[in-house]
């Protein structure tokens, strides 16, 4: 009972920081789990994130031949499993008979997880960010309901509000939905205005390949709406050059993570979760 209460408090704390206005608290989002130390999108990688104190883990979804949602980034299993072909051409049992590969392409003991397995592992411990998974919105929501984890999952899409609402109806209002906006592309401001008019999202994922004045003005516009900012530090083209490797390899964390925080970001998605957590703890 005590352990359950602690877990519930952990999710409540993360949700409060995600949904509220607490600029002093930065949430760390780990991209494809802890892929440097475990197979990407694996249960072990997710457990590593839980153990190190990550706030949210990012995953991707595909559907098997027999209709199960599994956690996989690519359309094929060629890169990440000891097999070849499209995920959709295999049954879940066939995929489970194979093994995931690690970052240097060696077969491990780990199996591809289902969304249900991931949500049960994460329940009460860590938030989940479904990135490549909008195509399965309704099916994913059914899994969240079944596992009792609707309150700890974020679903995202880079689509206009009108399309997302038309395709999902009332379900859209039952989840934490985060629009993805590419600030360096035409129409970005119109997408922001559309969402602000209709739903005022808890946060926007902002993508930008430069940090010119036009992009910075749009970042400020989103910040001024009261919605939180989710910014990727994964590689330069996602954050105007203020990426993880700039922090780690060039030893310029203030020009990377510090710059992102100074733009008002509440959530930082990283491929260096342990180092970002260390950086944030030192800043307290």
Residue locations for each model-derived region?
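Phosphate-group recognition and catalysis centered on beta-loop-alpha active-site segments
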Residues: 2-284
């Amino acid at each position: 009972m005590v352990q359950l209460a602690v877990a519930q408090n952990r999710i409540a704390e993360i949700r409060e920081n995600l949904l509220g206005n607490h600029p002093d608290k930065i949430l760390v989002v780990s991209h494809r789990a802890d892929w440097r130390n475990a197979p990407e999108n694996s249960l072990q990688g997710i457990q590593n994130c839980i153990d190190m104190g990550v706030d949210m883990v990012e995953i991707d979804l595909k559907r098997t031949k027999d209709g199960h949602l599994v956690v996989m980034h690519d359309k094929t299993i060629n890169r990440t499993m000891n097999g070849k072909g499209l995920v959709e051409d295999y049954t879940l049992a066939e995929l489970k008979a194979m093994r995931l590969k690690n970052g240097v392409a060696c077969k491990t003991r780990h199996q591809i997880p289902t969304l249900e397995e991931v949500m049960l592992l994460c329940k009460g411990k860590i938030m989940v960010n479904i990135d490549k998974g909008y195509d399965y919105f309704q099916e994913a929501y059914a899994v969240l309901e079944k596992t009792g984890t609707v309150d700890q999952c974020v679903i995202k899409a880079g689509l206009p509000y009108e399309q997302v609402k038309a395709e999902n109806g009332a379900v859209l209002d039952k989840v934490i939905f985060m629009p993805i906006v590419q600030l360096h592309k035409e129409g970005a401001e119109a997408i922001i205005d559309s969402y602000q008019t209709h739903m005022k999202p808890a946060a926007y994922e902002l993508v930008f390949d430069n940090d010119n004045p036009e992009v910075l003005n749009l970042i400020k516009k989103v910040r001024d709406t009261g919605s939180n900012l989710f910014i990727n530090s994964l590689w330069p083209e996602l954050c105007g050059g203020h990426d993880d490797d700039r922090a780690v390899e060039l030893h310029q964390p203030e020009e990377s993570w510090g710059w992102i925080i100074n733009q008002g970001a509440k959530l930082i998605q990283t491929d260096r979760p342990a180092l970002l957590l260390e950086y944030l703890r030192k800043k307290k």
